[in-house]
Amino acid sequence: IQTIKQMLPVEIYKQTPSVDVKWIMPCASINDAPRFRYRGLHLDESRHFFGMEEVKRYLDIMEVHKLNTFHWHLTDDQGWRIEIKKYPELTSVGSLRSGTCVKKDFNSTDGIPYGEGMWYTQEQIREVIDYAAAKGIDVIPEIDLPGHMLAALTAYPELGCTGGPYSVWTRWGISDDVLCAGNEETMVFLEN
């Protein structure tokens, strides 16, 4: 379908009908197949939240470029962006950080709290998956573990190896704090 759309005037991509455009398609024989099975893009919303409208726009652009896999990075040390109903603190606590790293030395932040309400409900996640599927795009939602879990550990410190205290990271890089694989509560958390 995208190859056919590309043969039509650019107005095919507009949201409103265009009446002053000639919708003519040249006679053609199309032999079009992807070279690679996996043609994807990655979007990191754990560190910077975009919201539903932008994610759908991203998927629209992916469709135009015949990409078929959306790798959606939803959790990391800097923020938790997906609702898990059994663990509400993941979003009420884990989505919030006290600032964002803005300098190359990684030790200074802008001091501006970030993340209030910046997460997706399960219904919104389903909506994005359905929207993507209608465009022939598979969604790979990423939840990092056992590392890159400071947002989760801030919400549930008992899941860590040290018990904390933890805070949602305002830096970039790799934290030493991870989920404790030897902790039975951690295993229950992962199963849920």
Q: Model-predicted segments: where are they?
A:
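Feature activates predominantly on carbohydrate-active enzymes
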Residues: I1-D177, A181-N192
